[in-house]
Amino acid sequence: MLYQAKALHGYKLNGRDGEIGKIKEFYFDDHYWTIRYLVADSGNWLTNRQVLISPHALGIVNKDAQNIAINLTKKQIEDSPPLNSEEPVSRQFEQDYYNYYMLPSYWDSPFMLGQYSSPSPSMSIRGKLPKSTFGPKTWDPHLRSTHAVSGYHIQVKDGDGGHVEDFMIDDETWIIRYLIINTKNWWEGKKVLVSPRWIKSVDWEESKVFVNLSREAIKQSPEYIEGSPLNREYEAALHQHYNFQGYWVNESPQNNSP
């Protein structure tokens, strides 16, 4: 199912021995446009540090109860590699994090999220893999915050196309399937969806996303009504409008992630 990122903010994260916090935002990698961490607001439990949860540990999203089951205990999270609340995520931290939970690293492993039908059982075991050779200040330049990228300007072939308002996330693979674009910058404020696959480039310093579409194509695009569920019929019409093949055509349930 596809969820708006902002709609998931505030969802409770229920660990094996109680609530560990609520979803605050998401970190995604800008190469595969896949969520790599949920950032949890742990309240007064773990202060002055970021609580990052890998999608490998996530169970089913319960929309009615607005919570997600986490295959972790509070003790595991408390003993995990710490990251200061003001500190950027470094590759050294990620290596330590993935070693601790004995997870295959997404940056150099053929085993990617989407190949597991349930949270990895290794999340319950502390890893004892070799220490990383990355330097302590090797920041990961490819991790982006959904909060920070919201508001980025969309540049189409013939001018301003609007701005990024939110993201549509697939809760089975945790891939960002669409960016929600608000066109009020230049048109009537209609909201449309744009797939990351249609993005030509991103200027992270200038906060601009360049898309190989025209204003007229966006005008004629099927409108996205905020809060309405997305079905395959709508997605098919959207892809047909832009003459693109649907992402689901070449994906299988056991191999649907980059």
Residue ranges and their predicted role:
Residues 1-258:
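Peripheral interaction segments used for macromolecular assembly
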